[in-house]
Amino acid sequence: MKRLNLLFICLILSFSSLMAQNGVKELQLEEISSGYFKPETIQGIVPMPNSDFYTQMNKERTQIIKYSFQTGEAVEVLFDVNTARDCTFKQFDSYSFSPDGTKMLIATETVPIYRRSYKAVHYLFTIKRNLIEPLSDGGPQQVPVFSPDSYQVAFVRDNNIFLVKLLYNNSESQVTQDGEPNKIINGIPDWVYEEEFGFNSAITFSSDSELLAFIKFDESAVKSYSFPLYGGQFPQHKAYNLYPGTYTYKYPKAGEANAKVSVHSFDIKSRVTREIKVPIDEDGYIPRIRFTPQTDQLAIFTLNRHQNKLDLYIANARSTVSKLILRDESPQYIKPEVIDQIVFYPNNFSFLSEKDGYQHLYWYNSKGTLVKQVTQGQFEVKNFLGWDANSNTFYYESNEGNPLQTAIYKIDAKNRKTVLTENKGTNKAIFSTTLSYFISFLSETT
């Protein structure tokens, strides 16, 4: 391994030297690390709720501009740091809409933590009033999320969950009290869950906005791991220019104990917290929780340590009674990404499974009974993109016809299939929230 590393370094140095001799610009570490060489594409498209419009942040990170899905033309500027009332910042990093589309959460001063997690100072922007105001004065927040009625925001600070009520002068209350670094984490995953299961938030509101559910991670028994921090070039850590620092976090190596996880619900009116118990192996995982459209019904996903058995429980978040409604097993491995392909509708939910040898789209009712297998054949469904209730039409991305390419398809109630993209290559799509339009992204070798 040392020889390979040395050979790699020598090759890089030789390549850089050769480039310099030939008058070619040398590669710079900052350029490599910053994404300078990424292919150009349209980025940051955010579909607006209940509409055929989308938004983008401008390159200067000073405006949020509204566009039409139908024409691709700019319609209006929804937010501008120079004209918004009481705006004290000059740039912002990201944003999200409330479910009713009347408000936005705008993130500033973002500080990355791990691959997906970050802290930021968030502001609440009311579009009609053109008014910006701090979400909280208590310090940076993680994973702020609107309630379905758009009148509350939950977030995490210092491993505890907080709740802001927008109808009560943005009053803030603390939901959990036991959060502590390297011991108890509420509402956000530990490093292992974030890295292995690809998510950074473990908070969800009930459909009536009266309950809040979250995962608690107890990593008290997990062994710590430390590594040195140096000044560096990109990013720079000036505090460690003279003497290196140390970063310590809980890191369970293979075969060692993981964090103990539990699911809890919080009644916002009564302020009662309940633990919801589901059958799970001692070393099992809870990679996601999500409220369904049915009031009080919480979906809890569990995986065994080998990650080849996925269970879906539906729990009553008030009574804490749970029931197993779906189990999917694989001889090898179940990709955790399939959990994000599960979308709950009032009477049904979608599910991707390899149970017949290929990853296909399945349609279940809310009790876990299979209604139908939507797609079949010697190909795979890569992504479920949506279901139109009015026409009973499914939209998805598939590699049918060529395993090296993907296309966007729709299939109606009579199983009539239509290809929606014509160009050969890897096709991706972002749909409007009404499913009336989509933006297609094509990647090809030519």
What role is predicted for each listed range?
Residues 29, 33-34, 77-88, 173-195, ...:
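Surface-exposed loop and turn segments in beta-propeller and other repeat-based domains
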Residues 54-60, 68, 96-99, 105-116, ...:
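Beta-strand C-termini and the immediately following turn/loop, strongest in propeller blades
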Residues 73-111, 131-142, 329-332, 378:
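Blade-loop segments of beta-propeller domains
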Residues 72-74, 109-114, 118-121, 175-203, ...:
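Predominantly five- to eight-bladed beta-propeller fold
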Residues 116-163, 168-202:
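Asp-box/WD-like beta-propeller blade repeats and closely related beta-sheet repeat scaffolds
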Residues 42-46, 53-64, 76-78, 93, ...:
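Non-catalytic accessory segments flanking enzyme active sites
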Residues 40-45, 89-96, 188-208, 288-289, ...:
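Signature of short aromatic-glycine-proline-rich micro-motifs recurring in repeat-based ectodomains
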Residues 49-50, 99-100, 148-149, 207-208, ...:
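Residue-level detector of Asp-centered blade-edge/turn motifs that repeat once per structural unit
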